[in-house]
From Swiss-Prot:
Belongs to the potassium channel family. H (Eag) (TC 1.A.1.20) subfamily. Kv11.3/KCNH7 sub-subfamily. A motif (Selectivity filter) lies at residues 627-632. Heme inhibits voltage-gated inwardly rectifying potassium channel activity. Residues 1028-1055 form a coiled coil. Residues 41-70 form the PAS domain. The chain crosses the membrane at residues 413-433, 450-470, 495-515, 522-542, 550-570, 642-662. The S4-S5 linker acts as a signal integrator where it both couples voltage-sensor domain (VSD) movement to pore opening and closure, as well as providing a binding site for other domains that regulate activation and/or deactivation of the channel. GO terms for molecular function: heme binding; inward rectifier potassium channel activity. This is Voltage-gated inwardly rectifying potassium channel KCNH7.
Length: 1196
């Protein structure tokens, strides 16, 4: 029965603990995340903001190297040390000059403390900043006694009492203060000024380790860092300085000239890495600086890079145990090593040195937990800084969790003992404690009465319970589990300790031995203090207050317990008052007279038995609590009457509260039934008001009854909306978990994509016989069947039966608009379906394009409900309403499929592919029939609009080889063919019929009928693997072009009619020279590659009436005939076409020059302004210009 609250689930309280502890100590610190790029700052306290002048928004997400605090006086050496500490995940303290926001400088000690998880990987950095006062700056140590024991130095978070200890502490940050194995370098000379190292041979830029330079540079950008790498330790166990001497032999001669003083810059401790992970940080590739620096850790067994010569024993130890014992930092202020030139050879001779070097002979192997280091440095106590990980509450050895199974069992046991105490303590105090019982107990102790033994055991159990409460965790105000014994004791003392202690005191044992009446009465009263334990029962049972049945039982038990207590009090009043009554009118005397057991003063055992007394007292209290009493047991004395008044008053309150709650509880139990009848009444009223016929009425009632049984009248969507969106996504992900795991189309989706899909899914429950989709309904959703079976009927004929994990609907990505169902879908059994709306699915696919191709490739419909004629309906709707084209394009998606996916789709959906082939074959036959019976130009134009949907001829040989191209990719390619708009002239009109006849003959070049038909129909061998959706898209765009072509042709015909009607002067028309015979043996109508503005060409030759031939009289007659035929709705006759053809042959030599120009420039001619009716013809011919993207009619 424990309350499982607080720190039950594992959680990370690291940040909260750090912030809460540090804020009260006036610290100035930041916390950086070591797992993100540049170790970004994730928290800075108010002290840091006050110290630097920057606000928290200015500091957050900045690199923890604090580049914004750097300035001209900030030394690169200090910056490099901070960067090296961050790269190596090592603890270090550096004295740096920083700049306030207002530009002023300040000096502070920067303490970098890595916080690692249980695997030793640095998760965070705590960087503390502490001002350096002038006294600390001036206190430069003159000499440090190497033998001086340091045992009484109390460190308080970076502060030290003696300046002389600062240098020593810089060298051994994490060593215990009592550690005698300390390396101290005693220099012979000390000065306050640094001496230039004239003879010091600095490593060149080429000899510096590139990885180290890059690593350091990456952390101190944008400032440039020096390629020198400063370390404070050797690289080998046997001879720590031999590598240094071998690399720079001239350093031995120049060492005496170096300054041995510790300036502010050299005061910094240049500590080595504390583990293998830190050493690996030196050789990290620059590109991987901010990755997991410890992802390839192997505990020192395999270290790559320039540190291969280091022994595993050194790598496995810490910097405090093995590395500091070789420290020679006091010998040279700045040691610069070239890691790339370190060799594994060892020299036998040690380097000469004039200084006195004391190195401890033996160093212990120690492994300091980072948590302990941080705790020691920050002085926060033992359990202040937990490891950065998901962790269960830390408890001591003998501490009991308040939600543990043992505590739950113990609480139930104590609850039973409390109930026993509540019942037997008043009974024992009222009925059993008398002179005779006291005399028996003095003679034989507790062995005479078993009840006394039980009371003693209960007292012992309650004392043990008090001890357990001192070791039981509790939940504080921050919802955290407190396991500290001291805090638990304080919390228990402030709470229930006093009540539990009073209830557990065995008062009868404390005053055992005295046999007076006052003692007996006092023991009875003190034993009633055990009833205080009922308060614990109340706090334990509080969690069950929301259950109606539990509350009802609890109220009844309370009512009976109060009646029991009042019965004991009623008997105690009569028993105490009876010896002092002279008339014997008490209720006990009346009871003795009624049952024939009168009291005899000389016999103490006379009178009614204890059983008779208790039952009668309990009867009186129950009758008084529930009513005014029957009267057979009545109060006679004043004391009894006063008590009866109190019982009646308590009874009225108890009756009102208990039975009022009982009525509310009963009403709550039947609330579901009441809601059902209310909703059913609404359904029946709806049926009556709308006069719904009986079959449909029966279906409504049956569905309502089944739905109520299934959901108990609860609207699941309303319940789901009551939770935050994050919980809604998790709930939806759980509800659709089986579908998302079993369906092949959803495999491989990211977690975010699955959550988005789960939010869009709706669960539908259908009873048997319910029709889910009717024939002709718009398919607005995709259905996934998760339970049950359904049947699909066409004309009441079952065409398919679907079961679990089947999918039906339509391929939503292939169509711009939803289609119509071609069958009925009816449930055979109770079915659970997951459906997702078409728009919702497409929206998710748009948001996750990487998942879109996978989903659409692997989506396999068990049954496609889309009607076969839906494609034609879609094309017709688009052609009838061009204004909706943009809306349709919003739903068009460029879906690139691999060849395997296309083949899979074609094999998975044979019905669609067969329908497509049949549609192409029927359209092709229709095209051939139309071509064969082209009786007139107008009818041929109307007939050829259908086959021209794929008249985009690919003129380049390479384009046809590409497969799987979208139509958007084909349009620019086909644009190489230019539209030669020569329909302005009469010759172009008359050549339409001849083009049809001539086009049927094979051409010598590339215009064979088979090739042209394949190119025109778009069903060539190389493009046979196009998907149905891509063909649909091409059809849509081509239909739009045909519409524009039809309107343009109508305009051209109207303009021609106007020209024929208005032309009164016999003049030779400005014919296009490109209609000459021999030069045009290839298609002359081409698609323009680009939509260039059309320019008019002015001819140098102007025609005069004297140049006209006699044949123009025939031409005029033919024109008049054409005018009459066209105005009357009859097509152009063939006679006019023959006359025009012969006339053009005669006039070809006159327009040869213009023809050559037009061939070169591909510019369409207009009527020369010098000709008669030039203004009218120009206006009319301008209207003949087509859009450059319109497909032209192919001709010779």
């Amino acid at each position: 029965m424990p309350v499982r609250r607080g720190h039950v689930a594992p959680q990370n309280t690291f940040l909260g603990t750090i912030i809460r502890k540090f804020e009260g100590q006036n610290k100035k610190f930041i916390i950086a995340n070591a797992r993100v790029q540049n170790c970004a700052i994730i928290y800075c306290n108010d002290g840091f903001c006050e110290m630097t002048g920057f606000s928290r928004p200015d500091v957050m997400q900045k690199p923890c190297t604090c580049d914004f605090l750097h300035g001209p006086e900030t030394k690169r050496h200090d910056i490099a040390q901070i960067a090296q500490a961050l790269l190596g995940s090592e603890e270090r303290k550096v004295e740096v000059t920083y700049y306030h926001k207002n530009g002023s400088t300040f000096i502070c000690n920067t303490h970098i403390i890595p916080v690692k998880n249980q695997e030793g990987v640095a998760m965070m950095f705590i960087i503390n900043f502490e001002y350096v006062t002038d006294n600390e700056n001036a206190a430069t140590p003159e000499r440090v006694n190497p033998i001086l024991p340091i045992k009484t130095v109390n460190r308080k978070f970076f502060g030290f009492k003696f300046p002389g200890l600062r240098v020593l502490t810089y060298r051994k940050q994490s060593l215990p203060q009592e550690d005698p194995d300390v390396v101290v370098i005693d220099s012979s000379k000390h000065s306050d000024d640094s001496v230039a190292m004239k003879h010091f041979k600095s490593p060149t830029k080429e000899s510096c380790s590139p990885s180290e330079a890059d690593d350091t540079k990456a952390l101190i950008q944008p400032s440039k860092c020096s390629p020198l790498v400063n370390i404070s330790g050797p690289l080998d166990h046997s001879s720590p300085k031999r590598q240094w001497d071998r690399l720079y032999p001239d350093m031995l001669q120049s060492s005496s000239q170096l300054s041995h003083s510790r300036s502010r810059e050299s005061l910094c401790s240049i500590r080595r890495a504390s583990s293998v992970h830190d050493i690996e940080g030196f050789g990290v590739h620059p590109k991987n600086i901010f990755r997991d620096r410890h992802a390839s850790e192997d505990n020192g067994r395999n270290v790559k890079g320039p540190f291969n010569h280091i022994k595993s024993s050194l790598l496995g130890s810490t910097s405090d145990s093995n590395l500091n014992k070789y420290s020679t930092i006091n010998k040279i202020p700045q040691l610069t090593l070239n890691f790339s030139e370190v060799k594994t050879e060892k020299k036998n001779s040690s380097p000469p040195s004039s200084d006195k070097t004391i190195i401890a002979p033996k160093v212990k192997d120690r492994t300091h937990n980072v948590t302990e280091k941080v705790t020691q440095v920050l002085s926060l106590g033992a359990d202040v800084l937990p490891e950065y990980k998901l962790q269960t509450p830390r408890i001591n050895k003998f501490t009991i969790l308040h939600y543990s199974p043992f505590k739950a069992v113990w609480d139930w046991l104590i609850l039973l003992l409390v109930i026993y105490t509540a019942i037997f303590t008043p009974y024992s105090a009222a009925f059993l404690l008398n002179d005779r019982e006291e005399q028996k107990r003095r003679e034989c102790g507790y062995s005479c009465s078993p009840l006394n033994v039980v009371d003693l055991i209960v007292d012992i159990m309650f004392i043990i319970d008090i001890l357990i409460n001192f070791r039981t965790t509790y939940v504080n105000q921050n919802e955290e589990v407190v396991s500290d014994p001291a805090k638990i004791a304080i919390h228990y003392f402030k709470g229930w300790f006093l009540i539990d202690m009073v209830a557990a005191i065995p008062f009868d044992l404390l005053i055992f031995g005295s046999g007076s009446d006052e003692t007996t009465t006092l023991i009875g009263l003190l034993k009633t203090a055990r009833l205080l334990r009922l308060v614990r029962v109340a706090r334990k049972l509080d969690r069950y207050s929301e259950y109606g049945a539990a509350v009802l039982m609890l109220l009844m038990c309370i009512f009976a317990l109060i009646a029991h207590w009042l019965a004991c009090i009623w008997y105690a009043i009569g028993n105490v008052e009876r010896p002092y009554l002279t008339d014997k009118i008490g209720w006990l005397d009346s009871l003795g007279q009624q049952i024939g057991k009168r009291y005899n003063d000389s016999d103490s055992s006379s009178g009614p038995s204890i059983k008779d007394k208790y039952v009668t007292a309990l009867y009186f209290t129950f009758s008084s609590l529930t009513s005014v009493g029957f009267g057979n047991v009545s109060p006679n004395t004043n004391s009894e009457k006063i008590f009866s008044i109190c019982v009646m008053l308590i009874g009225s309150l108890m009756y009102a509260s208990i039975f009022g709650n009982v009525s509310a509880i009963i009403q709550r139990l039947y609330s579901g039934t009441a809601r059902y009848h209310m909703q059913m009444l609404r359904v029946k009223e709806f049926i009556r008001f709308h006069q719904i016929p009986n079959p449909l009425r029966q279906r409504l009632e049956e569905y309502f009854q089944h739905a109520w049984t299934y959901t108990n009248g609860i609207d699941m969507n309303m319940v789901l909306k009551g939770f935050p969106e994050c919980l809604q996504a998790d709930i939806c992900l759980h509800l659709n978990q089986t579908l998302l795991q079993n369906c092949k189309a959803f495999r491989g989706a990211s977690k975010g994509c699955l959550r988005a899909l789960a939010m869009k899914f709706k669960t539908t429950h259908a009873p048997p016989g319910d029709t889910l989709v009717h024939c002709g309904d718009v398919l607005t959703a995709l259905y996934f069947l998760s339970r049950g079976s359904i049947e699909i009927l066409k004309d009441d004929i079952v065409v398919a039966i679907l079961g679990k994990n089947d999918i039906f609907g339509e391929m939503v990505h292939l169509y711009a608009k939803p289609g119509k169902s071609n069958a009925d879908v009816r449930a055979l059994t109770y079915c659970d379906l997951h459906k997702i709306q078409r728009e919702d699915l497409l929206e998710v696919l748009d948001m996750y394009p990487e998942f879109s191709d996978h989903f659409l490739t692997n989506l396999e419909l068990t049954f496609n409900l889309r009607h076969e004629s839906a494609k034609a309906d879609l094309l017709r709707s688009q052609s009838m309403n061009d204004s909706e084209g943009d809306n349709c394009k919003l739903r068009r998606r460029k879906l690139s499929f691999e060849s395997e996916g296309e083949k899979e789709n074609s094999t998975n959906d044979p019905e669609d592919s067969a329908d497509t082939i049949r549609h192409y074959q029927s359209s092709k036959r229709h095209f051939e029939e139309k071509k064969s019976r082209s009786s007139s130009f107008i009818s041929s134009i109307d007939d050829e609009q259908k086959p021209l949907f794929s008249g985009i001829v690919d003129s380049s040989p390479g384009i046809g080889k590409a497969s799987g191209l979208d139509f958007e990719e084909t349009v620019p390619t086909s644009g190489r063919m230019h539209i030669d708009k020569r329909s302005h002239s009469c010759k172009d009109i008359t050549d339409m019929r001849s083009w049809e006849r001539e086009n049927a003959h094979p051409q010598p070049e590339d215009s064979s009928p088979s090739a042209l038909q394949r190119a025109a129909w778009g069903i060539s061998e190389t493009e046979s693997d196009l998907t149905y959706g891509e063909v649909e898209q091409r059809l849509d765009l081509l239909q739009e072009q045909l519409n524009r072509l039809e309107s343009q042709m109508t305009t051209d015909i109207q303009t021609i009619l106007q020209l024929l009607q208005k032309q009164t002067t016999v003049v030779p028309p400005a014919y296009s020279m490109v209609t000459a015979g021999s030069e045009y043996q290839r298609p002359i109508i081409q698609l323009m590659r680009t939509s260039q503005p059309e320019a008019s060409i002015k001819t140098d030759r102007s025609f005069s009436p004297s140049s006209q031939c006699p044949e123009f009289l025939d031409l005029e007659k033919s024109k008049l005939k054409s005018k009459e035929s066209l105005s009357s709705g009859v097509h152009l006759n063939t006679a006019s076409e023959d006359n025009l053809t012969s006339l053009l042959k005669q006039d070809s030599d006159l327009s040869l020059e213009l023809h050559l120009r037009q061939r070169k420039t591909y510019v369409h001619p207009i009527r020369h302004p010098s000709l008669p009716d030039s203004s009218l013809s120009t206006v009319g011919i301008v209207g003949l210009h087509r859009h450059v993207s319109d497909p032209g009619l192919p001709g010779k």
